[in-house]
């Protein structure tokens, strides 16, 4: 699984995961992705075959509902709760995402809330 981290998620999370061999991009690190609208960022993730990771449930859930209504598949959406994974605790978020990266059973068009690794 490949990931694209939404702009509000630290590039340090992506850096840690890349250091461990994972294919992860962060919008915060890419001037071409910073400032994109949520639908445009989701489209980029789909074109690149990436699940999108975001704190922004309110804007991205309607996008995946629209995909479902049109019977279009997507590469997944991972919602991060800001109270469980504050932005300054990027190591914990990276560890939880690494646990998720090995889960082939998720398949396509999944929506998942990020949990602590091992939980």
Report residues per predicted region.
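Acidic, PIN/NYN-like endoribonuclease modules and their adjacent C-terminal/linker elements
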Residues: 1-7, 11, 15-18, 33, ...
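Short beta->alpha connector loops at strand-helix junctions that form conserved
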Residues: 28, 56, 81
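Acidic, metal-binding active-site segment of PIN/NYN-like and related structure-specific nucleases
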Residues: 38, 44-46, 50-63
């Amino acid at each position: 699984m490949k990931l694209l981290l939404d702009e509000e998620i630290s590039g340090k999370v992506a850096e840690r995961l890349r250091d461990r061999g994972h294919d992860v991009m962060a919008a915060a690190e890419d001037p071409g992705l910073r400032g994109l609208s949520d639908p445009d960022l989701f489209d980029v993730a789909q074109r690149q075959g990436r699940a999108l990771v975001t704190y922004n449930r309110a804007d991205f859930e309607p996008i995946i509902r629209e995909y479902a209504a049109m019977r279009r598949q997507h590469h997944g959406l991972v919602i991060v709760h800001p109270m469980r994974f504050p932005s300054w605790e990027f190591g914990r978020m990276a560890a939880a995402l690494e646990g998720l990266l090995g889960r082939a059973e998720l398949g396509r068009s999944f929506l998942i809330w990020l949990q602590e690794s091992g939980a």
